[in-house]
Every structure is written in structure tokens, then in C-alpha cells.
């Protein structure tokens, strides 16, 4: 069984670039341990002979038949954008 230690939580905190309080670390240690204990319990379930289920809902996304055709207003739409590069519209990047 995997044991969640303070060192492990500190390592994960560093990897995630978080700054947690001591109370938050203790809470995470408890939560992580509960999650890992539950996964360990699931690993003990006997699934011998059980066929894998890839999706609980069969045929959930029916696709309609396509009718490809050329979009004729392409040049009109491109005129509304300030920049174009290699036949594509160019928009500002999204930055945080």
C-alpha cells in the first residue's frame, strides 16, 4: 500500500508550483491517502472473466450523413479580419 508522506506532498506542491499552508498540506495528505486507499480497494476486485466495458452508453453519438461543399463566402469573411497569412486569417494570440 502506498503511504502519503509530508515529503511527497511537498514534492507535489513544488511540481505544481503551489504555496500551501501547513493545514492545507495536512488536509491534502489525508485526501490523497483516502483516494489511494480506495484505488487499492478497487485493485482487489476480482474481474476475471468480466468483459471490458468501453462505454456505458452504446451508440451515444449518431452522426448525420455529410454533404461536403465549398463555402462561397470565404473571401468576404477574410476581408473582415485585419491580417491574413498564407490564405488563413490571423488573430491575436491568447495569453494569460
Swiss-Prot record:
It is an enzyme of class 6 (ligase). Its EC number is 6.3.5.-. GO terms for biological process: glutaminyl-tRNAGln biosynthesis via transamidation; regulation of translational fidelity; translation. GO terms for molecular function: asparaginyl-tRNA synthase (glutamine-hydrolyzing) activity; ATP binding; glutaminyl-tRNA synthase (glutamine-hydrolyzing) activity. It catalyses: L-glutamyl-tRNA(Gln) + L-glutamine + ATP + H2O = L-glutaminyl-tRNA(Gln) + L-glutamate + ADP + phosphate + H(+); L-aspartyl-tRNA(Asn) + L-glutamine + ATP + H2O = L-asparaginyl-tRNA(Asn) + L-glutamate + ADP + phosphate + 2 H(+). It holds the Pfam family GatC. Keywords: ATP-binding, Ligase, Nucleotide-binding, Protein biosynthesis. Gene3D superfamilies: Glu-tRNAGln amidotransferase C subunit, N-terminal domain. InterPro entries: Asp/Glu-ADT_sf_sub_c, GatC. Belongs to the GatC family. NCBIfam families: gatC (TIGR00135). Allows the formation of correctly charged Asn-tRNA(Asn) or Gln-tRNA(Gln) through the transamidation of misacylated Asp-tRNA(Asn) or Glu-tRNA(Gln) in organisms which lack either or both of asparaginyl-tRNA or glutaminyl-tRNA synthetases. The reaction takes place in the presence of glutamine and ATP through an activated phospho-Asp-tRNA(Asn) or phospho-Glu-tRNA(Gln). Heterotrimer of A, B and C subunits. This is Glutamyl-tRNA(Gln) amidotransferase subunit C. It comes from Thermotoga maritima (strain ATCC 43589 / DSM 3109 / JCM 10099 / NBRC 100826 / MSB8). The gene is gatC.
